[in-house]
Amino acid sequence: MSFAVRGYIERIDSELVVGWAYDFKSPNQPVEVQVRQDSRILADTIADLSRDDLLEKGIGSGRHGFSMTISNDLCNQLYRGEAEIWVSDARSESWYRIAELRELN
C-alpha cells in the first residue's frame, strides 16, 4: 500500500519538533501536523514553511516544512513513545502516524 502523504521528523528537543510533511495528491496544499496522546491533541501546526532542500529534491513548492514549539515534558513523552506525531492529507480526511526520525537524503 502506498500513501499519498509523507512526513519526516528531523529533530526533537526540549523546545521544538522540526520536520516536513507533504501530500503528493495535493502538492500545493499544506497539511496539518499534530502531536497526540491517544485521542488527545497536545500540539498542532501547519506544514507550510519554505525549505530550499525540499524544493531541490522536487518535493512540491518546497513550502512543506514545520517547526512546532513543545514543552520539555512533551518532548520526553515523544521519546518514551507515550505521544505520537500524526500528519493529515490536505483535505484532513485521513491521518497517518509519522514513525521515522531522519534527515532528508
Pin down the residues of each PLM region.
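Basic, ligand-binding patches in group-transfer machinery
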Residues: 1-105
